[in-house]
From Swiss-Prot:
GO cellular component, one term: proton-transporting ATP synthase complex
Native organism: Erwinia tasmaniensis (strain DSM 17950 / CFBP 7177 / CIP 109463 / NCPPB 4357 / Et1/99)
Membrane topology: Peripheral membrane protein
High-level lineage: Bacteria, Pseudomonadati, Pseudomonadota, Gammaproteobacteria, Enterobacterales
Leader sequence segment: none
Places the protein is found: Cell inner membrane
GO MF entry, a single one: proton-transporting ATP synthase activity, rotational mechanism
Protein name: ATP synthase gamma chain
Length: 289
């Protein structure tokens, strides 16, 4: 059994670590609330934009934009949103497993994949497993701006425009609540119909009026749509990251408390054994006299 002094030193080390994890938990909780506010502010715009684009995809357009046309799939692209920092539980690895599973499903059909990575953790992982990373962005901090994401988005849109990829997906964590975040894969291109758009179009033959003309409007609008969906994915992933980190740090703090209790019991036993030995030596010495 370890000596009382050594055990006392271990207890002190665990207590110091516990203070750090508790502080990190509180910081993550504060950042999560701010991320939730940012996510809530951008979500209505992203959802409305998606609904409008869904109606356009089912409408009777004079000009059929390439982003609305299905085509034979020879190669797919993924915009993968990960984190720049760790200590957030299984948030990243669960997302990466989802991407790999989807890539394998396409590979079984003879379709290859390109990756544009947002976040250093994703870049590190997919570089290590041999993924074809064609663009990356990292170091966006706690307040990501759309300008930080333009690089990877532009690369993937250009690849789609030139026919080098035939489908484009965004992969990110959807924030459900503080305790639950779920990896999701959402198709960006070609534009999928909105969830309720098909039923609306079946009941009515209405369409939008375009000014000055459909091509000029759609060329800009559809790119803004993709950018808005990517930005929304990033802010939701950031909220998910902070929530996962808060939960992970709370678990670490609680585990530290349990470990301290166990070490305290061991320390008490060691101290008791030491006292018993000292008493035995005193009694033995007295008997010898």
């Amino acid at each position: 059994m370890a000596g009382a002094k050594e055990i006392r030193s271990k207890i002190g080390s665990v207590q110091n670590t516990q203070k750090i994890t508790k502080a990190m938990e509180m910081v993550a909780a504060s950042k999560m609330r701010k991320s939730q506010e940012r996510m809530a502010a951008s979500r209505p715009y992203a959802e409305t934009m998606r609904k409008v684009i869904g109606h356009i995809a089912l409408g009777n357009l004079e000009y059929k934009h390439p982003y609305l046309d299905e085509r034979d799939v020879k190669r797919v692209g993924y915009l993968v949103v990960s984190t720049d920092r760790g200590l957030c539980g299984g948030l990243n690895i669960n997302l990466f497993k989802r991407v790999l599973a989807d890539m394998k499903a396409w590979a079984d059909k003879g379709v290859e994949s390109d990756l544009a990575i947002i976040g250093s953790k994703g870049l590190s992982f997919f570089s290590s497993v041999g993924g074809n990373v064609v663009a990356q962005a990292s170091g966006m901090g706690d307040k990501p701006a759309l300008s930080d994401l333009i690089g990877p988005v532009k690369v993937m849109l250009q690849a789609y425009d030139e026919g080098r990829i035939d489908k484009l997906y965004i992969v990110s964590n959807k924030f459900i609540n503080t305790m639950s975040q779920s990896p999701q894969i959402v198709q960006l291109l070609p534009l999928p119909p909105a969830d309720d758009a098909e039923g609306v179009v079946k009941k009515s033959t209405w369409d939008y009026l375009y000014e000055p003309d459909p091509k000029a409007l759609l060329d800009t609008l559809l790119r803004r749509y993709v950018e808005s969906q990517v930005y929304q994915g990033v802010v939701e992933n950031l909220a998910s990251e902070q929530a996962a980190r808060m939960v992970a740090m709370k678990a670490a703090t609680d585990n530290g408390g349990n470990l301290i209790k166990e070490l305290q019991l061991v320390y008490n036993k060691a101290r008791q054994a030491s006292i018993t030995q000292e008493l035995t030596e005193i009694v033995s010495g007295a008997s010898a006299v």
